[in-house]
Amino acid sequence: MQHKDTAVAKDTAKKRLLRRNSAPSAIHIISRLDKKWSFLWNTIDRHNIVEEQDESSAAKSEEEHEDDYELEQLLNMIRIPMFLEKFMLFALLTSLDCFLYYFTVLPIRLIKGYVKQFKSYRQHYRLQQRSGHKNKIPFRYRITSREYKERCMIFIIVISSILLSKLDTSKLYHRIKRQSTMKLYMLFSVLEMADKMLASLGQSLLTVMLSRKNSERILLHKCLLVSMSLTYVTIHGYVLVYQAISLNIAVNSYSNALLTLLLSMQFAEIKSSVLKKFDKEGFFQITIADVVERFKLTLLLSITGLRNLQSWSSSLSNTSINFWSPRSTLSIVINILCGPMVSVVGSEVLVDWAKHAYITKFNRIRPQIYDKFYYIIYKDYSTRTHKLEDRLGLPLPAFVVLFIVMVRPTLFKSSEPSYLPSLFRILFMGASVFLLALLAKFTLDLILIKWSKRIEQRFRDQAFNTVVTEEEYVPGLLSGGMGKVDVSTRIALHSDYNKENRIETESVSPMRKRKTTLTAECTPPSLNDIRRQKDSKNPRSLENVARYKMVSKRIW
């Protein structure tokens, strides 16, 4: 019994000893947790102290209004469509005025020049009759440089239209329609690139051919330049005919695959241009490119609408007259003419809004810079020269050839079931189209003249110029990447640890005191400094911007 009692006593003593040893371990764990929580709170407090120190430092004083600037940028993105569409509307109307010039004013001037030449010939013939037949002087009429330009342009347009009128557009339509979606995507891309390359080449070629020096060259050089220009206009017109038929297929397809493909190509412009660094010249050039793109889309869709309207009217003539009603006819006509424009041009407008809004945001540009573009286009239009056409890079002769080739069969097919003779019907349709174009040109000129007077009065009161200053930019740091680097960080990144011009910064810690020498001499200029130096070096550089001129890193 005594042995059992001693064993039980030993076990009890061991348990008590274990309890005593376990109690301090729990206390130790709690104390360690306390230390961790205190370290965490000290870290949070330290971050708060650092933020308070940063807010009170001199480096933060320049960025104290950064929130206001960010709010201004958001408001500018909302205001961009108003400024952009005002510029676009004026530029598109002036482009349409230049386009109608080839159908109205140019033929009138050509006829006037030939009438003047005929009158001089008749006057010379009468003088020869009065003086007798003894001293015969051969008749020589020296044409002016303007008459030479007009005759060359009419000759090129007429011959190119005759050559391209031999194309069977229905065969081209079905040949393109049979292709797969991937091939059509490649076709759209190739035609777009070919259009830009030919437009750039044609602008230089036509400028040389229509120059004043060319009218004084020998006949061989003149014929060579005219033949080269004729070849260019014919090839460019052929490319534009392919573009018009491809767009017609995409718009008229029963499935939305081709139209979706076309819209996706438009939205691809955002990816290629938004996340880029722009200067004022590049921004003006991409705005001009958007004007040309929208004008070309409107022209191609107008041709598509006229061809669809002609095919619908021919199918309507084969049906019974009992199914016709004015309300249904008007709705069908509106659907044919306005349906493609709403989908394609509407998406183009939305893409332009988003693209310009983000370009101005990333490059910290205020929308008032569109007034500079607006004023430059107004000055080009008011001079009544080809400067506007050269700045915009509009291939108007190729557009005129495209319109004649695609619309001429439509107009004459619509008048086929007529009792009039064929020649008289052609003359009647030609005269009707000419009078309508002349009326549109006259109305458009009145609108633009009135608009130009308002622009002149507005900018005269403000003493406006095309110089871009710091007022056209939102204050703040520009960045080539996704983040921003302030001045002190840039100095630290580009420090050279030299002895000259060093800046000593001390960071005191409880353990030790450390000195770091930073050099501001070797720090390269920031993006803001580069832009400021470039603007001050050439303040009126916007006036030298053209569509196909390398004024920035690339041509848009």
UniProtKB/Swiss-Prot annotation:
GO terms for biological process: protein folding in endoplasmic reticulum. Keywords: Endoplasmic reticulum, Glycoprotein, Membrane, Mitochondrion, Phosphoprotein, Transmembrane, Transmembrane helix. It comes from the Eukaryota. It is found in: Endoplasmic reticulum membrane; Mitochondrion. The modification Phosphoserine is found at S22. GO terms for cellular component: cell periphery; endoplasmic reticulum; endoplasmic reticulum membrane; mitochondrion. Its main location: endoplasmic reticulum. InterPro entries: Tatp1. The chain crosses the membrane at residues 88-108, 152-172, 225-245, 331-351, 392-412, 429-449. Interacts with SLP1. Belongs to the TAPT1 family. This is Endoplasmic reticulum membrane protein 65. It comes from Saccharomyces cerevisiae (strain ATCC 204508 / S288c). The lineage of its organism: Eukaryota, Fungi, Dikarya, Ascomycota, Saccharomycotina.
